[in-house]
Design a protein with these regions (language model features):
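Glycine-rich FAD pyrophosphate-binding loop
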Residues: 105-126
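Dinucleotide-binding Rossmann-like beta1-alpha1 core, especially the glycine-rich loop
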Residues: 129-223, 232, 349-352
Length: 586
């Protein structure tokens, strides 16, 4: 479909949803640009989504204003040149760090820039950690292609980086409730759920070369006693994987660092300089980096980064997913991850489920809800109730009082609802790696290889290093060691014998290792992600003061200036004595 036809189709969408609103439409190179105003965020999303569904559309840039719209204030950058790089990667999530590691194989000066104080601080830290096989993705999409390939790469990479990864398997289950909210009569819905749906899944699996099998109701209930008696059938996917997304991201970054990549944390990009139609430099809060190539892996802010270069071809609309986390003891009641199919399916949402984590806890979720604020990681009472309502259909007898925490993460979706990975058609040297929502974790290794091919096609010379080392030695995890191994570790370092976090059996030695790591932990949450201190039943109620003390001692940062997860998240307002006596400086 050419630009003129796309413009006519887009105009009909606007007339349908915003007839009386001042909306301007233009189409360039199969990208739909929307400008003007609408009545609500829901209307903004609806128009963007329908434009994204148009056949042949590459992207949707939705600049429509709505009453709730927030303008993010950017910090001031520094023009002073602080160095040069062949490639600058914007974003320290799993995708950015995968690309950094892949580029570290070559004789290049690579700089990774991350606005947070640590890597894996966005979507990469708050997801269900599933390494999807590709069975749940729309056929023919870039998502599906890269998910299938990335899934096949995981075992080798996680072995090299000493990151936990298991193919625990997943049951995809249909029940008598699967078609309850449709107009299909009950007896017919049950027949479809029991016989037709499993057949469709198996046919799709065969096309993708995935080893999946049908499981009878009897076998399912024998293997998973917590599953509802209303279950009708299931399909088992034995290769469904699980990892720790933040440990994986940290390991990728550490290995990239060891192979020569410069990692700049707490550094925000505020502008991209373009000269004669090509990338010239990246302006950050720490200074300017001269470069000819920028890889935009900025997740929720990818459209803003593209805007800085005059290369915007999409808009990110955040989708929030809330998740409940259960105590490890209760989680032992479930043997494999479980997913329930409910119809009609919510568009662009796989449905979540009861997901086993690599550490043995169970997660219920995630949900999916459009939000306009890219920092909204709240969890509401309504979202918790929605989680219980949906997944109790699958495991009604599961002890719900075993919840120990809840959290939410944000998916960085474009309106075409597919990955947007290509060289900019407007600015030479600017590479889009945007719209990386689920299954981005699974696809990350394949995305990195794809980006490498794009860079090669754009003229970047890639000469392999002979000294590249793909291996990374992970820190010791004392709770996983045998008694003899523990004794040896404690003999070498007595701090491994001092328990700080009782719930997760984390020692002082492990916390010190995290603080002294190649990418050092400088916040309470950074230590939590590396060691699990504070992730147990008491959620840091016991160990938090001790973690703060160790962090202060090792870094020289006063305890009252220690942060939870970023520069504005101080845990304390000051020392109690000086506050009471009025001697505080501030």
């Amino acid at each position: 479909m050419n630009d003129r036809k796309l413009a006519r189709k887009a105009a009909s969408i606007v007339r349908k949803h915003a007839r009386d609103k001042p909306v301007h439409i233009r189409v360039e190179d199969r990208v739909v640009y929307l400008e003007g105003a609408v009545s609500s965020y829901e209307e903004y999303v609806r128009i963007g989504r329908e434009a994204g569904r148009l056949k042949g559309v590459r992207g949707v840039v939705n600049r429509l204003s709505f009453p709730e719209k927030m303008e993010r204030k950017r910090p001031v950058g520094k023009k002073e040149c602080i160095g040069e790089a062949d490639v600058v990667i914007v974003g320290g999530g799993v995708v950015g760090c995968s690309i950094a590691r892949e580029l570290s194989r070559y004789r290049l000066k690579v700089v990774l820039v991350e606005r947070a104080e640590d890597v894996a601080c966005g979507t990469s830290k708050a997801n269900n950690a599933m390494v999807h096989t590709g069975i749940g993705e729309k056929m023919g999409t870039l998502k599906q292609k890269l998910c299938v390939k990335g899934h096949q790469m995981y075992k080798k990479i996680t072995d090299e980086l000493q990151v936990p990864y298991e193919q625990q398997g997943l049951y995809i289950i249909t029940t008598r409730d699967s078609f309850a909210k449709t107009k299909i009569p009950g007896f017919l819905g049950n027949f479809i759920a029991k016989h037709i749906v499993p057949l469709i899944i198996l046919r799709r699996a065969k096309k993708l070369g995935l080893p999946m099998k049908r499981v009878s109701r009897k076998e399912l209930l024998e293997n998973e006693p917590q599953v509802t008696e209303r279950a009708l059938a299931a399909v088992y996917s034995p290769t469904y994987g699980i990892t720790c997304p933040y440990l994986f991201t940290i390991a990728l970054a550490e290995n990239a660092l060891a192979n020569g990549v410069e990692v700049m944390l707490d550094t925000e990009v505020v502008d991209i300089t373009v000269k004669d139609g090509a990338v010239s430099s990246v302006v950050t809060t720490r200074g300017t980096i001269d470069t000819s190539f920028v890889i935009n892996a900025a997740g929720l802010y990818a459209d803003e980064i593209a805007d800085m270069a005059g290369a915007r071809e999409y808009t990110i609309h955040p989708k929030k997913g809330a998740t409940l986390l259960f105590d490890r003891e209760a989680s032992a009641l479930i043997n494999r991850s479980l997913s329930i199919l409910l119809f009609p399916r919510t568009e662009h949402y796989k449905g979540g489920g009861l997901m086993k984590t690599i550490d043995g806890n169970l997660q219920w979720g995630p949900t999916m809800r459009e939000v306009f604020d890219p920092t909204d990681t709240s969890v509401t009472a309504e979202e918790i109730q929605a989680i219980f309502a949906r997944y109790s259909l699958l495991a009604p007898r599961f002890p719900k009082n075993a919840v120990i925490a809840y959290f939410s993460g944000l998916r960085a979706a474009t309106f075409t609802e597919d990955f947007f990975i290509e060289a900019s058609r407007r600015v030479k040297g600017f590479i889009h790696v945007a719209g990386i929502q689920s299954p981005g974790l699974a696809a990350a290794p394949a995305i990195a290889e794809m980006v490498l091919d794009i860079l090669r096609g754009e003229g970047l010379e890639l000469e392999r290093k002979t000294a590249f080392n793909p291996y990374r030695k992970g820190p010791p995890v004392i709770r996983h060691l045998s008694p003899a191994e523990r004794e040896r570790a404690i003999a070498e370092n007595p701090l491994y014998g001092k328990i700080v976090c009782r719930c997760e059996e984390v020692t002082e030695g492990e916390i010190v290792d995290a603080i002294r790591a190649p990418i050092p932990a400088r916040s309470v949450d950074a230590i939590k992600r590396r060691t699990r201190a504070g992730m147990g039943r008491c959620q840091g109620g016991f160990c938090l003061p001790r973690v703060v003390h160790i962090l202060s001692r090792e870094t020289g940062i006063p305890a009252e200036k220690i942060v939870k997860n970023g520069r504005d998240s101080h845990l304390f307002v000051g020392k109690a004595k000086c506050l009471l006596e009025g001697e505080c400086e501030n």
